[in-house]
């Protein structure tokens, strides 16, 4: 059986690792051992931060919605509660975008939310409200 030398594959692996380490500072960009450790760590950070990114964007959307809704005299929580009671299903990303780019449409949603909250307050139950809306 022929002897298998793995120079080609290890060279390819090293080349791939060093390419991924391009732009790193110091030994991390040219020494394979340091580069491998740095690349592995960077992949862990990338994996973690893809999850964190989603949290950060949701928090940003909520802050924007809260700021826009307070101009109409509501808080974020009451606004979302009113939307749910009115049966309006719009996600936070779209609400945030509407608040910035389409203030008139966003204002209509705020008024619908206020109307739902006021009607429920005087009617008392959600079932009566849903039958009145339909």
Swiss-Prot record:
Entry superkingdom: Bacteria
InterPro entries, A to Z: Ribosomal_bL20, RIBOSOMAL_L20_CS, Ribosomal_protein_bL20_C
GO CC terms in record: ribonucleoprotein complex; ribosome
Any one Gene Ontology BP term: translation
Gene Ontology MF term list: rRNA binding; structural constituent of ribosome
UniProt-listed Gene3D superfamilies: 6.10.160.10, Ribosomal protein L20 (1.10.1900.20)
Keywords associated with the record: Ribonucleoprotein, Ribosomal protein, RNA-binding, rRNA-binding
This protein's record includes keyword Ribonucleoprotein: yes
Keyword Lyase recorded: no
PANTHER family reported in the protein's UniProt record: 39S RIBOSOMAL PROTEIN L20
HAMAP family: Ribosomal_bL20
Physiological role: Binds directly to 23S ribosomal RNA and is necessary for the in vitro assembly process of the 50S ribosomal subunit. It is not involved in the protein synthesizing functions of that subunit.
Family: Belongs to the bacterial ribosomal protein bL20 family.
Name of protein: Large ribosomal subunit protein bL20
Biological source species: Rhizobium meliloti (strain 1021)
Lineage: Bacteria, Pseudomonadati, Pseudomonadota, Alphaproteobacteria, Hyphomicrobiales
């Amino acid at each position: 059986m022929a002897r298998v030398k793995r120079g080609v594959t290890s060279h390819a692996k090293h080349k791939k690792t060093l390419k991924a380490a391009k732009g790193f500072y110091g030994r991390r960009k040219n020494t394979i051992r340091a580069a491998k450790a740095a690349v592995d760590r960077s992949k862990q950070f990338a994996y973690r931060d893809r999850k964190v990114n989603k949290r950060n964007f949701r928090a940003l959307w909520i802050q924007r919605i809260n700021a826009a809704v307070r101009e109409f005299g509501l808080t974020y929580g009451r606004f979302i509660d009113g939307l749910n009671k009115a049966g309006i299903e719009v996600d936070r990303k779209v609400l945030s975008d509407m608040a910035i780019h389409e203030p008139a449409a966003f204002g209509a949603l705020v008024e619908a939310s206020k109307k739902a909250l006021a009607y429920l307050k005087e009617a008392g139950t959600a079932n009566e409200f849903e039958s009145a809306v339909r």
